[in-house]
């Protein structure tokens, strides 16, 4: 009887340990299969690949559960109804694991749109200058993408501003919460388990001369409450958020300089918005660059990859918040971003680095260098189905937006550029901000930000400068090219000179009443100043599209 009692105690203790094990916070990879749908299509089965799918996991489509079958911890399928794709728009897809632990995954966008042969972006006024960082998400639960922007005031203090999305590419006036520290980086996640998206900032304490992080808890109505700072390296800032130890609580990763060497520091989440330092993975890099996260070797543990100036460093995870020594891979220039996604459809995570180098995953934690594409002027990238053809594309952002359309086999077409942003991007966020089924971009640089809505008509260039011309003389003409990049014919209502000094410019065009799919036309503009000094105007193109009108800025100087 005594032996039986001891055995019972052992079994009870073992059960208590195993039964109390939390489900991980899941991570969804791109692409979804299929990656997009035409409006009005029939219902279909959506396959989702990722990490940490527990028994009982459910796929949410715009926040509503769909019938889900978990195939393995890295794959599941869900039934998508015809009513889900009846109309143009972009669905937010997440996977939710049940308690204990668990919770919602990252959001992956599913465009519902007609496929197009090309993609272009039109710059629109932004929302906030002095931004140190920004993130997009549905922070108030109304189903519309919002922006949270972190400001940096002279590296001393800052603020967190909530911009409620209006669903048409514009945003309401901000609700601002103060920060005692400046904001250098910003990421989102539910850090206290209340179902609302919070934010965590990476910062530098000007008094203590240490890098720190601060969580801001979201009340669901646009206000954020600052928690106690944590961290304390020599330099660096927040570069990743994920459940790296599989306990169902989001963790935070920092990268930069610590104690005289490059390092990735892992802070495990406690589930209440606080964090505890777990480990430090040393590397050669001293800079705080973006980080890619995924299970690269298929062992059910999250791994990370960090960019450097001329290499990427792959750290395989041990599943407890620690990592094995890194393995480097050469690339130049590596750029300012890295994304993990399956770009060739073989079920293995690949890496898209900077602007643009592709490393194809072998499924065992190693990578084969793919093709390095010619730099397009933007080191910040995003991956998604930007033209609705079911294949992953890559978009890079700098002074313009460059689109590399994917071929589905790990290769990409030569980039096309559009946008002509007045500020070179140091950061960018992506999402369908006007709910037209097309993924857009908001970029930040100096001195402000701009919104790039994916457009019906591609326009290049975005501005014309004529220099100095004598009064009464006419400059040589310059040409604007207009291209229909949509999947349907586009009627053009008007092309007109507007702005301060339209009488100082001359415009002729070949566009007629509209453009068929893929067609182009030209607008010729010349400068004929009537008075001395700086003269400005715009060419305004009005057409049938949510992004209409588009404008091209004109400038010249009369002598």
Give, region by region, the residue ranges found by the protein language model:
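Feature for long, exposed domains in two main contexts
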Residues: 66, 99, 118, 455-559
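Short glycine/acidic-enriched loop and turn motifs that connect beta-strands
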Residues: 152-156, 204-209, 257-261, 311, ...
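Glycine-aliphatic tripeptides that mark coil-to-beta-strand junctions in extracellular
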Residues: 143-145, 195-197, 248-250, 300-302, ...
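Blade-edge motifs of beta-propeller repeat domains
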Residues: 113-129, 164-181, 217-234, 268-286, ...
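Blade-level signature of beta-propeller repeat domains, shared across WD40, Kelch, NHL, RCC1
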Residues: 426-457
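Beta-propeller blade termini
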Residues: 132-139, 184-193, 237-244, 289-296, ...
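Hydrophobic beta-strand segments that make up the repeating blades of beta-propeller
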Residues: 147-151, 199-203, 252-256, 304-307, ...
